[in-house]
Amino acid sequence: MGFLAAPLALYALFVIWPFIQSIYYSFTDWTGLSPEFGMIGFGNYSRMLDDEIFWKSLQHSLTFAVVLPLVTVGLALFFAFMLNVGGRRRKGAAIAGVRGSSFYKIVYFFPQVLSIAIVALLFQFAYNPNSGAINSVLKGVGLDSVQPDWLGDPDLALICVMVVLVWSTVGFFVVLFSAGMASIPRDFYEAALLDGANRFTTFFRITLPLLWDTVQSGWIYMGILALGAESFAVVQIMTVGPSGGGPDYSTIVLPLYVYQKAFRDGQAAYATTIGVALLLVTLAFAAVVMKLGRRERLEF
């Protein structure tokens, strides 16, 4: 255990200790600037439970945690399966990926090369109701009457943000799942096809079971991204208005609300209280996914 002492000490210092400090400060009235503060017990937690904006941000964060992994992982599995197994049969091979699959993987992965801030800015320009690319295309096909204010409409803003997050992350999972599928022996697919199975059947009976551990890890990772920095960056750049968090707080999420309370309003103690709630939500999400996704490990 001696060689683990230094890494464990660093982990405790830079990961565990900040969490402990945050929990401690959540019981105080610290502003974040003054060295003096007093203990107020569960005052911040009582305030949080009565805070309508907190509940709205929690609702949006939970929506992100459920919808984004479902859509992103689902699309990534479909694209990866098509790239590796979905092509037409060729001479000497019972199964094959689509032609040019290596090129498509590069195309799908390209958004990962861009900073999430750049991606958010690009889509902010595209969503512009007056000069954006999306409304310009709608005008070009004769839909002049359909010109939504994408980020200014409370009913559309959250969906627009989620589209950006899916677009920016799906390529990473396509490459991840493609690597996993490439390690599955082709004999399994050939035997299944000889027995009369189609590609739909082989996906659910061969690919998905053998790739399950990777899918589960990807689901948890995407959920953590949706609850953390990725959602904060996109919402902060694309939709923050005078009140913060889009029109009528329609896109406010927990990480952004923590930031606003800590750095805009000078309420660091209350911000750490919301941060504790975010920590509990993240841990609960990971625990639920691991519990629901638990199954016997398949070897090949």
Q: Where on the chain are the PLM-derived regions?
A:
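A structural signal for multi-pass alpha-helical bundles of membrane permease subunits
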Residues: F3-F300
